[in-house]
């Protein structure tokens, strides 16, 4: 599971996530990428599940890059606890993802294998995603959507 080695502050406010992603929205390392089409928090468990889905499908071939990192702590108070008494303890870590963000990249495999591996990774994530090639970058309009809600 991914989490920071150390942070300046233990707890963080929720914050807001308006607009599109202006950073990390190009396929840089690999040939194919998985682009987020919705804003969301992606937990470290979901990132790990998607990574396992990709590596399990491509077997030994290919290289995978994880372009997001869970650096935001999410706190939770124990069950059946009354209001007040301060903020709860850190429960898990999330990565804040905006639309247009490339979350995973893949190289060294055939196009059909890469598309299927990234489609399987998209099934593990709580948002709609789009598989893109390095050539078709910057196309947020009319996406060929891969939804995790289907099936």
Curated annotation (Swiss-Prot):
Keywords: Ribonucleoprotein, Ribosomal protein, RNA-binding, rRNA-binding, tRNA-binding. The keyword RNA-binding applies. It comes from the Bacteria. Disulfide bonds: none annotated. GO terms for molecular function: rRNA binding; structural constituent of ribosome; tRNA binding. Pfam families: Ribosomal_L16. GO terms for cellular component: cytosolic large ribosomal subunit. One of its GO terms (biological process) is translation. Gene3D superfamilies: Ribosomal protein L10e/L16 (3.90.1170.10). Belongs to the universal ribosomal protein uL16 family. Binds 23S rRNA and is also seen to make contacts with the A and possibly P site tRNAs. PANTHER family: 50S/60S RIBOSOMAL PROTEIN L16 (PTHR12220), LARGE RIBOSOMAL SUBUNIT PROTEIN UL16M (PTHR12220:SF13). Part of the 50S ribosomal subunit. This is Large ribosomal subunit protein uL16. It comes from Chloroflexus aurantiacus (strain ATCC 29366 / DSM 635 / J-10-fl).
């Amino acid at each position: 599971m991914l989490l920071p080695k150390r942070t300046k502050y233990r707890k963080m406010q929720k914050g807001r996530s308006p607009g599109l992603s202006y950073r990390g929205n190009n396929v840089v390392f690999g040939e194919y990428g998985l682009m987020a089409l919705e804003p969301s928090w992606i937990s470290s468990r979901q990132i790990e599940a998607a990574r396992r889905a990709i590596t399990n499908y491509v077997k030994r071939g290919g290289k995978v890059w994880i372009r997001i990192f869970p650096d935001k702590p999410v706190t939770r108070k124990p069950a059946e606890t009354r209001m007040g008494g301060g903020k709860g303890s850190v429960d898990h870590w999330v990565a804040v993802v905006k639309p247009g963000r490339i979350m995973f990249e893949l190289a060294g495999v055939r196009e059909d294998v890469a598309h299927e591996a990234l489609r399987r990774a998209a099934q593990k994530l709580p948002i709609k995603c789009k598989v893109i090639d390095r050539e078709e970058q910057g196309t947020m309009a009319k996406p060929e959507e891969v939804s995790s809600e289907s099936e």
